[in-house]
Amino acid sequence: MASGSKDIVIVGGSVIGCATAYYLTQLGALDGCRIVVVEKDPSFATCSTARSAGGVRQQFSTPENILMSQVMIDLLRNLKDRFGPDADVGFREQGYLILASREGADVLRSNVEMQRAHGADVHLLAPEELRKRFLWLSTVGVACGSFGASGEGWIDPVSLTTLFRTAARGAGVEYLVDTVTGFELSGQFIVAVKLASGRRLPAGAVVNAAGPSAGAVAALAGIRLPVEPRKRYVYVIDCRAAPEALRQAPLTIDTSGV
């Protein structure tokens, strides 16, 4: 805190930035300081949060990601206890199904073993088990699959962001519609955040919550962060006239391609 300021500036006001702001208030970070969130797109029209599939899973290849997901799942299951009786993010706990070809089967088996060791309710299924459980699924070219029977599914990420943002504002967090254009440094410390509007925010700490733009934000401080945006695609299929079994399908991943 070379600037002498105790204020915390969070760059990015989508789900990560809003969650960070909210939990900082729960830790008492507002005592004697300001928390300011800077977001250039408060409508969420172009942010990654609004354009994501909203997937929630524990099927990762590193323990850290699994443990972080478990914290999130506990929050989703107890959302009303924290945010009130009307809190709803459309959590559909229908699971994740990850399919593997013969080439990827060993990696999938290893991942499932590690996931289960960390408490994830994930099951490795052979092709015949997959066909019995998911009648709509063709297992041609599939060596095995891993299914998250609980604690996985999807949400509406904008609704979750709105909950965090509303709660953070209610606790005293300030939100600015602006764009970060640079930082003032004192040695290795950031002492102020510069905005496109010309404003200058003294800062004792800065949180980079810019999502896929985090690399560009870090570069403003002379830091190389290997994060960059990459275009991906989400296809939505209208299944209202589909059989019940298909409407209850998990979020399915086939890494071998289509």
Report residues per predicted region.
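Beta1/beta-strand and adjacent pyrophosphate-binding region of the FAD-binding site
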Residues: 2-16, 36
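Dinucleotide-binding Rossmann-like beta1-alpha1 core, especially the glycine-rich loop
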Residues: 53-133, 257-258
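Helical element adjacent to the flavin cofactor pocket in flavoenzyme catalytic cores
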Residues: 147-205, 213
